[in-house]
Amino acid sequence: MRRLLFIICVFFLSVTAVMAQKEKVKNQPYADLKWFHLGFHVGLHAQDLILTNTGVATNGETWYAEIPSYSPGFSVGVIGDMYLNPYFNLRFTPTIHFGDKKFVFRRPEMEGVEGTDENPVVSMYSTSVRSNYLTFPLDVKYSAFRVNNYRPYLIGGIYGAFDLGRKKGNPILLKGTDFGVEFGIGCDIYLPFFKLCPELKFSFGLVDLLEKDRSDLTDLELIKYPNSLSKATSRMVTLTFNFA
């Protein structure tokens, strides 16, 4: 992730250097001087969890969980942007993220072992958890000097999140609320009638989301899967296109 951020920073610095070579007519020259303005954004995201396995056996079985791949989800929200000074803005962006996560549980010691019809060997189990997050990020935006019709920026802050897609009875149940920090990078592109702002953001949850009380599980065979985990914290990568 550090390498990715370095590449992004180098890219924006290179673009700024190239654009600075020739002055152009500026679209919306006073757009950034508004005390407050509204907008909206749409984009894609990938949800993930940092999982901590217990390594503890349940009924003689030791399972290890992972999220092997990411499924892209859809994000949409509104933007409220308040002017602080020529370089800093305060931004509030309520957003809803529609997505899911696929868990894969494995028993390494049983992989490759063949069972019988009477005693089948189960070495892998998979399940999906749908998470529709309603997030409320509060960020500070630092914008570089505007060059022609482009202005790169950095953004960072905190967020609260509520999971609207929780469903009891699933082997993995996540808590309904989360809190974390986020940071990102973007660029304001000044068009004749509005600003288009591609933005890449990274979010890291600070709350253990794993629900440990699983009295809702009616199938006792499933309890070994949540018992194989001790902690789960969220993280998300979001690519949005802001219109303001």
Model regions: which residues?
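Outer-membrane beta-barrel strand-turn architecture
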Residues: D32, M82-P86, A144-N148, I189-P192, ...
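Short glycine/proline- and aromatic-enriched beta-strand/turn motifs that initiate or cap beta-hairpins
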Residues: A20-G73, M236, N242-A244
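Glycine- and aromatic-enriched membrane insertion/assembly motifs of diderm outer-membrane
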Residues: A57-E114
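Transmembrane beta-strands of outer-membrane beta-barrel pores
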Residues: L44-D48, I96-D100, A144, I158-L164, ...
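Residues that define the transmembrane beta-barrel architecture of outer-membrane proteins
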Residues: K34-F36, Y70-F74, R130-F136, Y150, ...
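Repeated loop/turn-to-beta-strand initiation elements of outer-membrane beta-barrel proteins
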Residues: D48, F88-L90, N148, F193-L196
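Transmembrane beta-strands of outer-membrane beta-barrel proteins
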Residues: F36-V42, L90-P94, F136, P152-I158, ...
